Amino acid sequence: MYSSPLCLTQDEFHPFIEALLPHVRAFAYTWFNLQARKRKYFKKHEKRMSKDEERAVKDELLGEKAEVKQKWASRLLAKLRKDIRPECREDFVLAITGKKAPGCVLSNPDQKGKMRRIDCLRQADKVWRLDLVMVILFKGIPLESTDGERLVKAAQCGHPVLCVQPHHIGVAVKELDLYLAYFVRERDAEQSGSPRAGMGSDQEDSKPITLDTTDFQESFVTSGVFSVTELIQVSRTPVVTGTGPNFSLGELQGHMAYDLNPASTGMRRTLPSTSSSGSKRHKSGSMEEDVDTSPGGDYYTSPSSPTSSNRNWTEDMEGGISSPVKKTEMDKSPFNSPSPQDSPRLSSFTQHHRPVIAVHSGIARSPHPSSALHFPTTSILPQTASTYFPHTAIRYPPHLNPQDPLKDLVSLACDPASQQPGPLNGSGQLKMSSHCLSAQMLAPPPPGLPRLALPPATKPTSEGGSSSPTSPSYSTPGTSPANRSFVGLGPRDPTGIYQAQSWYLG
């Protein structure tokens, strides 16, 4: 089992994240972290932050490195992807990127059937409603975690309880908000020296209105540390620029090697690596059970929507935007190998993605910082069984052994039709004449891991007689194939057949 030093990298470059990352506002990072700092300070000191302390925290967060903000946004997008129903994920990406008219995007409900809440930071005790997170993330509106009641769904929204489409979510403006907006507007007009913009009729504009700034300052106290101009400016800045993420490719080189052989329908893959800190945990197949996972958790994909169009958004991406393969997304999908004549740029595209799954920047390099992703008019790859993965040839990196015995056990358990066991750790050869292992050859099972059962396999005799299970034999290393003596382990005990058919996979 391998231990990954950076357990969050293998899910940071999913096509879902690559497409949405340019549309995330950088203000969201500052806002979520500022609220968490204030809450932590209050719990520790039992008093609120002073203005100077809060302003110092704000300046620190605004000056954070771009790569830190992008990694945070990638983790949050991966978490939001799990909270969106599988059939709505593609439509959500198309709506955010402007490729499709906005429609309802349903989220997975909580146990009471209402909008779920998630934490937006690592080890944060403050939770936010999903629709609040969407508005802050993609619109840059400074809402508190208690402002869920201020959100109003649009009239065209057909599922107001669970819809998290940002285009369907508005903020209710109260009379107090309008009253304060008037004074803020007047103050900005006086400071800039420009005439006041029209607030109503021409006759109303001609009347001189005097501001009693002293009375205003005595009546209202600004609780935040953002000025009006600064707030508008930072709320419109995207989290990524035209230069793409500033991740180090060496840093993001994770254990993402998968043997995707187009000739075989069963996908053989290595077991997921676990970090030494134990931040990963085994996942179940239920979407609802994965509530708030660690940033290094496995984010499972979903099949595309049956009501979606034949052409998916991942097939229209530029050649510079690649789709890394996830460990569970292709387990049930056959992989069809496209032909070079299907696309004029297919040959050049596959040359860049043939050797090893490396982590790509994932953002189209564009001179415009806040521009959306550009899509070609023709498809790069033809329609395949899995729309998320255009890669055709993916090999193991040199530091991973493709003949890992654990991988062979997974292949043996999942795909009994194509069993060809490989060498075991390079020191001995396990020659299998059937798909079952006897109990004598198995190592002691590690505790606490999922249990898999293998069906008994029979092999017809050469004389055409009845089929009977055969016993595996062991080959002594260091001898030539012709001189090797095979020692039979003898028939199995019928009473222990279930013990021989099941074992634990590490």
Curated annotation (Swiss-Prot):
MF terms in GO: DNA-binding transcription factor activity, RNA polymerase II-specific; RNA polymerase II cis-regulatory region sequence-specific DNA binding
Gene that this polypeptide is encoded by: NFIC
Phosphotyrosine sites (modified residues): 300
Database matches in PROSITE patterns: CTF_NFI_1, CTF_NFI_2
UniProt DNA-binding residue ranges: 1-195
PTM sites of type Asymmetric dimethylarginine: 365, 395
Superkingdom, taxonomy of origin: Eukaryota
InterPro entries hit by this protein: CTF/NFI (IPR000647), CTF/NFI_DNA-bd-dom (IPR020604), CTF/NFI_DNA-bd_CS (IPR019739), CTF/NFI_DNA-bd_N (IPR019548), MAD_homology1_Dwarfin-type (IPR003619)
Modification N-acetylmethionine occurs at: 1
Annotated region described as Disordered, given as residue ranges: 261-348, 439-493
Protein's name in the database: Nuclear factor 1 C-type
Oligomeric and partner information: Binds DNA as a homodimer.
Compartments where located: Nucleus
Annotated positions of the Phosphoserine modification: 194, 294, 302, 304-305, 323, 333, 337, 339, 343, 473, 475, 485
Modified residues (Omega-N-methylarginine): 365, 451
Positions of short motif 9aaTAD: 404-412
Family matches, as Pfam families: CTF_NFI, MH1, NfI_DNAbd_pre-N
Species for this entry: Sus scrofa
